[in-house]
Amino acid sequence: MKLASLLAAQWRALVLSTGFLTRLAPARAATDAEMAAGVAHYPLVGLLAGLVCAGPFLLGLLAGHPWVQALGYAALLLWATRGLHWDGWADLMDAWGSSATGDRFWDILKDSRIGAFGVLGIVFGVLGQVVLAHEVITLGRAGALVWAPVLGRAACVVLAACVPPGTRSTLGRLTSAGATHMTVLFCAGVTAATGVALAGPPAVLAAALPCACAVVWLTALARREGGLNGDFLGACIIQGELSALLGTILA
């Protein structure tokens, strides 16, 4: 009976996380404790998103047209995630690119309007994703397209574990609360196992360096500004995804 209750709770946490991070499950109301518990499932949500977005091309859709496949993959990821993480990426590029600090940094970060640095970040980020995906497909290692969202979401959990949430963001607080040592170890294990299976051990090792650099940079920036919010987490997911694709090419 206890096992059944545990499995039911974990299933609910997975569904809640899927609905929060993607449109692949219905969005549902959740308590703070449920949101925190769902953090452990972020890499699994990434795996589901990767399968949905890369699966058609792995099965041969648009075979022989790697540029179109790469663009389709990026477009499907945008659709599946509602552009949620790219929004955080753009906001962070605006705030960081302005060289602002303190309250001014947070004012820019939370401004719903996009600035020049945000536009540049989106253009070069999406362009980079398409180019890297094209190279991965051309190398015949398209399994890495499935793995990239896994690494991105695991990186987000590591970032949340490294930075005190501060008082500026409910999402930052809840994610940090869920990013316990055991959760980080579980996410790392899931990410390593899926990476070895889908991209190969050399790609996992090669992706670790740029991903670690991204987490270290975001950690330093968040600590300087007194905490993190959802924009930091979204930007970390994007950087983790790009790191997975880059690592696969370099391996």
Curated annotation (Swiss-Prot):
UniProt keyword list: Cell inner membrane, Cell membrane, Cobalamin biosynthesis, Magnesium, Membrane, Transferase, Transmembrane, Transmembrane helix
Q: Name one GO molecular function term.
A: adenosylcobinamide-GDP ribazoletransferase activity
- Catalytic activity from the UniProt record: alpha-ribazole + adenosylcob(III)inamide-GDP = adenosylcob(III)alamin + GMP + H(+); alpha-ribazole 5'-phosphate + adenosylcob(III)inamide-GDP = adenosylcob(III)alamin 5'-phosphate + GMP + H(+)
Cofactor section: Mg(2+)
The annotated topology with respect to the bilayer is: Multi-pass membrane protein
Q: What class of enzyme is it?
A: transferase
Indicate the transmembrane segments per the record: 44-64, 114-134, 143-163, 177-197, 198-218
UniProt EC number: 2.7.8.26
Under the heading Pfam families, the entry gives:
CobS
The protein's annotated pathway: Cofactor biosynthesis; adenosylcobalamin biosynthesis; adenosylcobalamin from cob(II)yrinate a,c-diamide: step 7/7
Domain of life of the organism in this record? Bacteria
**InterPro entries for the chain:** CobS
Localization annotation = Cell inner membrane
Name one process (GO BP) from the record: cobalamin biosynthetic process
What GO CC annotations are associated with the protein? plasma membrane
The family line of this record is: Belongs to the CobS family.
- Function of the molecule: Joins adenosylcobinamide-GDP and alpha-ribazole to generate adenosylcobalamin (Ado-cobalamin). Also synthesizes adenosylcobalamin 5'-phosphate from adenosylcobinamide-GDP and alpha-ribazole 5'-phosphate.
Q: Please identify the protein, giving its name as recorded.
A: Adenosylcobinamide-GDP ribazoletransferase
Q: Source species, please?
A: Nitratidesulfovibrio vulgaris (strain DSM 19637 / Miyazaki F) (Desulfovibrio vulgaris)
User: Gene name on record?
Assistant: cobS
